[in-house]
């Protein structure tokens, strides 16, 4: 009644005759059939993972709470509008009370707030190491637990290297800030010169005046478009809605590169003016200055200080302060806690300033500079005819005084 069957498994076991007595009579003899077993990894240890995963996520989110809070404040401060200094600002800047004012404003400083996560971490490490060493010294731990101490000689040898690393890092960041500032000085001066040349070159009426007014609006819109291009979170539609017309603004908003789109508006408008080649060449030279400004700004935005240099500085600082309590234990004991706090606050503050000024455009008063360009252009247009008529009137008065019936008075 029983027929021999070969059960073929994916593990290549065959001719398992010891399974024959377990076969039921209702099973008919059929060709051997391979049995394939599928492994589902999600079914293995799913119970503990479902319990541990939310706990680990909560722990990670708790550890990230303070850094995220300080980073949020720092980024909001980065987007605040800067203002140009006036005479009153410089008097306050030179005041002998500036030190008291700077110290009293420390709780609201974004640099100080950004130091909370690293300084708190390394101070906590110093407390743990000091507590451990004290427990070993008081024989609260078994004898095989060593006291964490080391010679300060390696620190004395590497301290100048760390100092130079921080100095060069900050100097490199400041040089980038200077490049950004000089680039915007050229952009603003080039925009003002271009607007002045257009105002002084166009004397016609009708269509030429319409083209001139539109061209001046495009020129004024360029620094605004570039400012929105290099500063994160800028609203170009809001900034340009009162500068250029709606249809032109919609075309600029659709462009992938908005500053170059404004340059195209300026270039096409210049071609429609009836100007001689000399004036056209002068205007084109000023436009080249604006295009160079775009290139400098994009290089500063897209190419940071070499990341290997930034990472080296960060790693050096972290390793330095992780081992600082061990180095200072023999000389300071529990004073390693305030010593680590002061060292971390000082050195990480220098490094943080270098990181902040590495991206220079949020540090510049670009909104006020753009508003100044607009006001200068409007004032130049309004005063052009007044000044021109006044000079013509003076010329006529001089001609009347120096001539009588076509002859010069003796």
Swiss-Prot record:
The catalysed reaction is: chloride(in) = chloride(out)
Q: Which Pfam families match?
A: Bestrophin
User: So which stretches are on the Lumenal, thylakoid side?
Assistant: 1-110, 169-315, 358-410
Signal sequence annotation: none
**Gene Ontology cellular component list:** chloride channel complex; chloroplast stromal thylakoid; chloroplast thylakoid membrane; thylakoid membrane
Q: Which parts pass through the membrane?
A: 111-131, 148-168, 316-336, 337-357
The entry's localization annotation reads: Plastid, Chloroplast thylakoid membrane
In terms of superkingdom, the source organism counts as Eukaryota
Tissue expr: Mostly expressed in flowers and, to a lower extent, in leaves, stems and roots.
Which residues are exposed on the Stromal face of the membrane? 132-147
Which Gene Ontology MF annotations are present?
voltage-gated chloride channel activity
Which terms does the UniProt entry file under GO BP? regulation of photosynthesis, light reaction
What is the membrane topology listed in the Swiss-Prot or TrEMBL record?
A: Multi-pass membrane protein
What does the record note as the disruption phenotype of the gene behind this chain? No visible phenotype. The atbest1-1 atbest2-1 double mutant has a reduced non-photochemical quenching (NPQ) during the dark-to-light transition similarly to the atbest1-1 single mutant.
Alphabetic keyword roster: Chloride, Chloride channel, Chloroplast, Ion channel, Ion transport, Membrane, Plastid, Thylakoid, Transit peptide, Transmembrane, Transmembrane helix, Transport
Briefly state the protein's biological role.
Voltage-dependent chloride (Cl) channel probably contributing to proton motive force (PMF) partitioning across the thylakoid membrane by anion influx into the lumen. Influences thylakoid ultrastructure, including lumen size and organization.
Question: What family is reported?
Answer: Belongs to the anion channel-forming bestrophin (TC 1.A.46) family. Voltage-dependent chloride channel subfamily.
What is the designated name of this protein?
A: Voltage-dependent chloride channel 2, chloroplastic
